Amino acid sequence: MILNAIERAPDNPSGPPLVLLHGLLGQARNFGLVQRHLAHGRRVLALDLRNHGCSPHQAGMEYATLAQDVFETLTSMKASPCILLGHSMGGKVAMRLALDHPETVAGLIIVDIAPRQYLPRFRPVAQAMLRLDLSSITSRSQAADALSDVEADPRVRAFLTQGLEAVEDKSGRHLGWRIGLSNIARGLPDIEGWDSPPGASFNGPALFMAGALSPYIKAEDHRLITDLCPQAQLVTLPAAGHWVHADQPDQFVTAIETFIAGGGFSP
C-alpha cells in the first residue's frame, strides 16, 4: 500500500531523509510545526498510516503489515535509507520496519512507547466512537461532548474527533469518519500487542524518548529496549506527557537534532 505523505524539503536537501509516523488515531498533519522546524537542510516526510488521515482504508493492523506499507511507500518515494521516527503506535511500526528491513533505516527515533504489550484501555473509547449517531451531530465539538462518558480530558476528545469531516450523500450533508475507524477498532488487539522475529535486533543508532509525565515507558522497559536496540539512548523530556511533540515541541526538536548530529546524520 502506498500511504499519503506530507513532504517538506529545502531546495538542496542533504543527509538521509527524516520520516515521521504518528500514533493511534493521529495523522501526518499532527507533526506540522515540528516538521517545519526539522526541514531545514533536510527532506522530512510525515506519513498517514493505513486507515488514518488521507491514506487508504484496508483491514489488517498487524505491525508487520503496517511496516510493509511504510516500506513500500519509502521505496516508491525514493526516501530510504532514512532516519525513522515513530510516536506511540507509529513507534512500534518503526521498530518493526527496522527489524524487517534494516537496510531501510539509518537511524531510529522512538517516542513514548516500548516493545511490549499494553493494556486494552482504548477499546471502550473506540466502541463509543463507532456508536456516535453522526446523522444528528453537526460539529466536531458536539461529537467530542458526546464522548465525555468514556474520556474526561477535553484535549483528548478533540484529538479523537479530528478524523470527522463533512460528507454529503443521499441523506444530505452530515459528518462522517475520514478514517477507517471500523478497521482500527477490529485491529486494536494487534495494536496493543507486540511481536517481532525471535532474537531480532536493530543494531543501528537509536533514540528512545519518554515524556516524564507519561506512564508508557517504565523503568522495567529499559531492558526490553536495549535488547531490541543495543545502541539505544534513552532520554526523558520534563513536563511532557504521552504527546511529547505537542507538550514540549522545542525540547522535542532539540532532542532529535542532537541525536542526528551525534549520529553523523547531519547535512
Residue ranges and their predicted role:
Residues 169-228, 233-236:
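Conserved serine/cysteine hydrolase catalytic core
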Residues 240-253:
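Catalytic histidine-centered segment of alpha/beta-hydrolase-like enzymes
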Residues 25-33:
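Serine-hydrolase catalytic-loop signature spanning alpha/beta hydrolases and amidase-signature enzymes
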Residues 135-196:
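Conserved alpha/beta-hydrolase catalytic His-Asp/Glu region
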Residues 1-19, 39-43, 79-80, 170, ...:
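Alpha/beta-hydrolase fold catalytic core
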Residues 95-99, 106-139:
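Flexible "cap/lid" loop of the alpha/beta hydrolase fold
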Residues 23-26, 88:
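Active-site glycine-rich loops that stabilize anionic/oxyanionic intermediates
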Residues 6-12, 32-39, 45-86, 254:
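Active-site loop/oxyanion-hole signature of alpha/beta-hydrolase fold enzymes
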